[in-house]
Amino acid sequence: MSLLRNRLQDLPALCLCVLVLACIGACQSEAYEGTPSPPPKLKMSHWSLVTGRMKELLEPVLKRTRDRWQWFWSPSTFRGFMQTYYDDHLRDLGPRTKAWLLKSKESLLNKTHSLCPRIVCGDKDQG
């Protein structure tokens, strides 16, 4: 049972890794589209056959992933996300920061004044 729980905890990290690999593959396939084909001698090597087969297997998956996530990478979607994030978290950051600094300053001054009679001035009750 605990093994299943550990696997479920690792699922988001695994999904993120798969997404990153898919994005990298999509970007690389776009970069290689304009490159010339390798010379015939290299074309027949074992490694080129392996890479060719892997490309043949992964290309449809990458194309589907790229097509499905195209809406996310569009400027309007990303701009909308950033605007929402700003509205939710950063719009009133200046006033909140000023209020926090004033509160912290007042708290620090109050603590300092409460310590002053004991440390610097001595107890008022003793004198």
Swiss-Prot record:
<dbReference type="GO" id="GO:0006869">
    <property type="term" value="P:lipid transport"/>
</dbReference>
<dbReference type="GO" id="GO:0070328">
    <property type="term" value="P:triglyceride homeostasis"/>
</dbReference>
<dbReference type="GO" id="GO:0010890">
    <property type="term" value="P:positive regulation of triglyceride storage"/>
</dbReference>
<keyword id="KW-0445">Lipid transport</keyword>
<comment type="similarity">
    <text>Belongs to the apolipoprotein C4 family.</text>
</comment>
<keyword id="KW-0732">Signal</keyword>
<dbReference type="GO" id="GO:0034364">
    <property type="term" value="C:high-density lipoprotein particle"/>
</dbReference>
<feature type="signal peptide">
    <location>
        <begin position="1"/>
        <end position="27"/>
    </location>
</feature>
<dbReference type="GO" id="GO:0034361">
    <property type="term" value="C:very-low-density lipoprotein particle"/>
</dbReference>
<dbReference type="InterPro" id="IPR028120">
    <property type="entry name" value="APOC4"/>
</dbReference>
<comment type="function">
    <text>May participate in lipoprotein metabolism.</text>
</comment>
<keyword id="KW-0813">Transport</keyword>
<dbReference type="Pfam" id="PF15119">
    <property type="entry name" value="APOC4"/>
</dbReference>
<protein>
    <recommendedName>
        <fullName>Apolipoprotein C-IV</fullName>
    </recommendedName>
</protein>
<keyword id="KW-0964">Secreted</keyword>
